[in-house]
Design a protein with these regions (language model features):
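Short, charged low-complexity linear segments at domain edges
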Residues: 2-21, 196
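Residues that line or immediately flank small-molecule/substrate-binding pockets and catalytic motifs
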Residues: 14, 42, 79, 128, ...
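A secondary-structure boundary/capping signal
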Residues: 27, 78-79
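Canonical Radical SAM [4Fe-4S] cluster-binding loop centered on the CxxxCxxC motif
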Residues: 9, 18-55
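Conserved AdoMet/S-adenosylmethionine-binding subsite of the radical SAM
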Residues: 62-74, 83-209
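Class I S-adenosyl-L-methionine
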Residues: 11, 24-27, 195, 226-229
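Short acidic, glycine/proline-enriched helix-loop-strand junctions
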Residues: 163, 201-230
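Conserved alpha-helical substructure of the radical SAM core
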Residues: 41-75
Length: 230
């Protein structure tokens, strides 16, 4: 049976989507959240039907990957939100069968779907959006409790991972950051990557119009949690 994965794009060679590894990044189509800072708005809709002209199919991508064995170290499934695709775990198995390590970018909107993917994954980039009780402010949808449960699943799985958050002062204030740091410490996380907002691809004119400026000093030194700004 042919694996079905709706693919919105492919980064053939990336060194940033899985720190320290040369990977191909598969951008899965569709996301249930509407984050204001999203720089891939074209990936939000859940398109159905035949692939568009020039759009990758999973079988074609498998054939391409087969010829890159020994060159690429891994395949990262990003999005959109890849865990919402029914064909994700089958695609991960096929990538592993080709000899590639498998990475995943996710916000954890459905913990059960993340749990199904974790046994097939070598590394996860987990997108923490906001303090759990304020997720709607960033995503436009409820989701804080789902994210909390997904983070707990990820921690308990033992899978190597990175928790990261996109920061813009119009979205997250200093108290928000302090609250998030406390939640991460409570969850047992020891490292948190804060990514300064970049306007490329973002559809929100208000965010693009204001430069983030200097990073808040409130988190530059914190006992028990390493905070890394990018």
């Amino acid at each position: 049976m042919t694996t079905t994965l709706r693919i919105g794009g492919l980064e053939k060679f990336s060194t940033v989507d899985w720190p320290g590894r040369l990977v191909a990044t598969v951008f899965c189509q569709g996301c249930g959240w509407r984050c204001r800072y999203c720089h891939n708005p074209h990936l939000l809709s859940f398109r159905v039907g035949a692939p568009l002209e020039g759009e990758w199919t999973w079988p074609a991508l498998v054939a391409w990957l087969r010829d890159r064995r020994g060159l690429l170290e891994g395949v990262v499934f990003s999005g959109g939100e890849p865990t919402l695709q029914a064909g994700l775990t089958a695609a991960m198995r096929e990538a592993r069968d080709l000899g590639f390590r498998v990475g995943l970018h996710t916000g954890g909107p459905v913990p059960a779907l993340l749990a199904a993917a974790l046994p097939l994954v070598d590394w996860v980039g987990f997108d923490l959006k906001a303090p759990f009780e304020h997720y709607f402010r960033i995503t436009g949808r409820p989701g804080g409790e789902a994210a909390r449960s997904s983070l707990q699943l990820l921690r308990e799985s033992g899978v190597e991972h990175e928790v990261r958050t996109t920061w813009h002062p119009d979205l997250l204030g200093e108290q928000d950051l302090m609250d998030m740091a406390g939640e991460l410490e409570q969850a047992g996380s020891r490292r948190w990557v804060l990514q300064v907002f970049r306007p490329d691809g973002c559809a929100d004119e208000g965010l693009r119009a204001r430069s983030p400026g200097d990073v808040p000093e409130v988190l530059l030194a914190r006992e028990g949690l390493e905070v890394v700004w990018r």
